[in-house]
Amino acid sequence: MNLKILGIDPGSKNCGYAIIERSKGKNILIEAGLIKIKPSTLQYQITELCEGLDLIFKNHSFDEVAIEDIFFAYNPKTVLKLAQFRGALSLKILQIHGDFAEYTPLQVKKAVTGKAKATKEQVAFMVKRLLGLSKDIKPLDITDAIAIALTHAANLRTRV
């Protein structure tokens, strides 16, 4: 059975997304990219994020959706802004798709590299290796989104 998974790495400047398909025990990268969010008012940026997500859902159907949970930040303003983006993103996913999975950055790093304290570069290296890709994927927002999708695929495999 083929399973299509959307992985999302939410951010206030760029939102990485990745679509993988799990088929016959292998993960295949279908598409990956960025929803670019231009500097503007918070309301406009949230609207851009939601419109970008709408386009992804219009062009693809998914069996599963997984997003990264908010990480700790030292700046309270940053945390509040990210929380608003994540809230809008969560609502949009629930409206379009329904339930979704959430993973902390530590869970994603551990699932992909085996180390909860891995660097973004180590995650990117393992994503490339796990998918058998010949080229590096840039920027790291995209590799993070792929890692989130791979984490969810691995989690589903262990639940079955």
From Swiss-Prot:
It holds the Pfam family RuvC. It comes from the Bacteria. The active site is at D9, E68, D141. SUPFAM superfamilies: Ribonuclease H-like. GO terms for cellular component: cytoplasm; Holliday junction resolvase complex. It is found in: Cytoplasm. It catalyses: Endonucleolytic cleavage at a junction such as a reciprocal single-stranded crossover between two homologous DNA duplexes (Holliday junction). Its EC number is 3.1.21.10. InterPro entries: RNaseH-like_sf, RNaseH_sf, X-over_junc_endoDNase_Mg_BS, X-over_junc_endoDNase_RuvC. Binds 2 Mg(2+) ion per subunit. Keywords: Cytoplasm, DNA damage, DNA recombination, DNA repair, DNA-binding, Endonuclease, Hydrolase, Magnesium, Metal-binding, Nuclease. The keyword DNA repair applies. One of its GO terms (biological process) is DNA recombination. Mg(2+) 2 binds at E68. Transmembrane segments: none annotated. Homodimer which binds Holliday junction (HJ) DNA. The HJ becomes 2-fold symmetrical on binding to RuvC with unstacked arms; it has a different conformation from HJ DNA in complex with RuvA. In the full resolvosome a probable DNA-RuvA(4)-RuvB(12)-RuvC(2) complex forms which resolves the HJ. NCBIfam families: ruvC (TIGR00228). Belongs to the RuvC family. This is Crossover junction endodeoxyribonuclease RuvC. It comes from Campylobacter jejuni subsp. doylei (strain ATCC BAA-1458 / RM4099 / 269.97). The gene is ruvC.
